[in-house]
Amino acid sequence: MQTTEQSKTLAKNYNAVKENIKKACEQAGRSQEEVTLLAVSKTKPVDMLMDVYHAGARDFGENKVQELVDKIPQLPSDIRWHLIGHLQRNKVKYIVDKVYLIHSVDSLRLAEEISREAVKKQVEVNILIEVNVAQEESKFGTTTEETEKLVRDISLLPGVHIKGLMTIAPFVEDPEENRTYFRKLRQLAVDIGNKNIDNVSMSILSMGMTGDYTVAVQEGSAIVRVGTGIFGERDYSKTI
């Protein structure tokens, strides 16, 4: 179990991030209520998640399906679980009825599998389209040029609802370097939103991580994905 000291540290970290979000919202003329702080809890033990839960977090993000499925029954039922990592089609069936939002849909084939499982389990699944705005070869995501067509194709599938876009910006020393990518994603969402496509909302932009979330908030992010800023450095040994 974590010590009380560690519980205090996690609560302090969580509240510091919330305060930074509040300030970024004020700078951008936004309400703090417009931004969800997603606690990225991958590789972290359940008791650390409970500490952050007690600090006020209700949205938690996991990268791996197995870890997500393992953690859900051990934690309070009012948590909203987000899958933010790359999703393989053969793992879809394990999570469609368990997650609040899938951030990482980047192909029609994946969306079709989500649709099949959603219909089978009689659930409605909310998704974001992952866009590789920075065109990094190491990252998943569709291109900005192909996003609208993908959105149109997925919008026709039963049981799947597009709620917006997600991007993973490059890891940079200066968060200002990523402002242009956040701006591009927001503009892409505006452009697609203006097309008024049935079964498509562009209300959620999932962008910004520990190193650059304040800039992302200033540029219109609705969900910031913060792991290290809350939990500290990840311990990858837990995943082996």
Which sequence ranges carry the predicted segments?
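Conserved alpha/beta-domain cores
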Residues: 1-211, 217-219, 231-233
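Gly/Pro- and small hydrophobic-enriched strand-loop and loop-to-helix capping segments
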Residues: 221-239
